[in-house]
Regions:
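N-terminal, active-site-proximal structural segment of metallo-dependent hydrolase catalytic domains
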Residues: 2, 18-83, 95-99, 248-251
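Bacterial N-terminal signal peptides
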Residues: 7-15
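Structured beta-strand-rich core segments of catalytic domains in phosphoester-bond hydrolases
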Residues: 24, 39-40, 64-136, 226-233
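Active-site beta-strand/loop signature of hydrolases that rely on acidic residues for catalysis
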Residues: 26-32, 47-71, 138-141, 157-184, ...
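Active-site-proximal beta-strand/loop segments in catalytic clefts of secreted hydrolases
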Residues: 30-33, 62-64, 91-94, 107-109, ...
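Extracytoplasmic/secreted envelope proteins and their assembly/folding machinery
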Residues: 44, 48, 74-77, 81, ...
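Sec-exported extracytoplasmic/periplasmic mature domains
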Residues: 52-56, 81-85, 89, 111, ...
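Metal-dependent phosphoester-hydrolase catalytic domains
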Residues: 116-117, 147-151, 159-169, 175-251
Length: 251
């Protein structure tokens, strides 16, 4: 009888779908170029469709207008919230044409809390969003084009993460190649989760990786990358989006 019960239990385990097992965090990073594609068309629904098809839990977004003149007063993140059904966080980096220009975040789960931290940028100021969720903290940014500013940003990011005891992810357009000094500096504190040999920019004929997803490696958590890809979307924006599914392991 016990033998039959054991076999029955094993059969049930085998029949449980993978989705019912402990799922990884599906992370997405996308420089959306204010939803203007390589065809010069601005299309919020097209960008939203790219995001929806990937079905991410959390998204870092770069290059968003908020009620600017060139955007005809439209709040770009609001359009993406509407079309994806996700929660949005916007961070203005600079005032621009009667509104602002900055970065954003979309999430299936409403954040517990978040903060926006200014980041250096001599060509234009930058920003970092740090949002806390139930099981992790997610950070989104868009770094300066200047290597000196990128290097200055690293200690500011690390300072902002002090005292956080949950697993931490960071994602965004970092404007630096994998072998650069800023990436070397980040690599001492973070593990890069995406495959940097797969290029992300420009979208039509990519020849470099400048978009990244990282896990913070200094507060004891381990991470198992279950999936990593660059979405082969060549038109919707001037960057291709990066996607990683990662399982958080205990300390």
């Amino acid at each position: 009888m016990k033998h039959h019960l054991l076999l029955f239990s094993l059969l049930l385990i085998m029949l449980v779908p993978a989705s019912a097992q402990k799922a990884g965090v599906n992370i997405f990073s996308y420089n959306v170029h204010n939803c203007i594609g390589m065809d010069k068309e601005q299309d919020y629904q097209r960008i939203a469709k790219v995001i929806q098809q990937a079905d991410p839990d959390i998204v870092a977004l770069q290059e968003l207008d908020s009620v600017t003149e060139r955007n005809k007063g439209v709040y770009a993140l609001g359009e993406l919230e509407k079309h994806t059904g996700m929660h949005g966080i916007y961070a203005a980096a600079i005032p621009f044409q009667g509104g602002s220009y900055g970065i954003g975040m979309l999430s299936k789960e409403a954040p517990i809390k978040y903060e926006v931290i200014p980041m250096p940028g001599r060509e234009e100021k930058r920003a970092l969003i740090i949002a806390e969720f139930k099981d992790y903290v997610f950070c989104a940014t868009h770094q300066s084009l200047t290597a000196e500013d990128q290097l200055l940003s690293v200690p500011l990011i690390l300072k902002a993460l002090e005292g956080i005891h949950k697993p931490i992810f960071l994602a965004g357009d970092m404007n630096s190649k994998p072998q650069s000094k800023p990436q070397e500096m980040l690599g001492k504190q973070f593990t890069t989760l995406n495959d940097t040999a797969v290029y992300t920019f420009p979208a039509d004929l990519p020849n470099r990786c400048i978009d990244y997803i990282y896990a913070y490696s200094q507060n004891g958590y381990q991470f198992d990358v279950q999936q990593q890809k660059v979405i082969e979307e060549a038109v919707a924006s001037d960057h291709r989006p990066v996607q990683v599914v990662v399982q958080i392991k205990g300390k």
